[in-house]
Amino acid sequence: GESKLAGEKSIAEAGIPYLILRTSWIYSLQGKSFLRTIKKLASENDMLRIVDDQIGAPTWARSIALATHKILEQYLRNKTEPSLSGIFHLTCQGQSSWHGFAKEILSLSDASQNTKLLPIPTSDYPTPAVRPIYSLLSNDKSEKAFAFKMPHWHDALKDCISSTPT
């Protein structure tokens, strides 16, 4: 987190137009992601302990890619427009806990429907990196500047699970 912030500050202080896109809770059908991990673990276990007190917006990588394409088209056409320069957030609409996200993944996929999900507090799941309890980002500035809305995370997850990995 600190190195990302330092990089953002350096870019902002350069005195030229810039575009920084922030996102969070990214998942995909490819690579290492919470979605793939939950599906795999559900196929191997009868019960999963999932953190239920961290809140964020699950965001499909494809949703980010599509939004980034729209943003770049507008930015490149209007680079000198001050409202299109700066830091912008790109996360799906809505919010969930990791437990809620896992529950939705299993309900929409062919993963084991018999796997029980046990909600646990963050304190019961220590990790090397400290994770914020509340990590929602507001898309208001992005929506106003670039005139678009990110999809709701439920809708993006349905589309992701029903899509074929490319």
Per-range role (PLM):
Residues 10-57, 62-70:
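NAD(P)-dependent short-chain dehydrogenase/reductase
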Residues 19, 48, 57, 94, ...:
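Residues that recognize and position ribonucleotide moieties
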Residues 67, 74-128:
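Mid/C-terminal beta-alpha module of Rossmann-like enzyme folds, strongest
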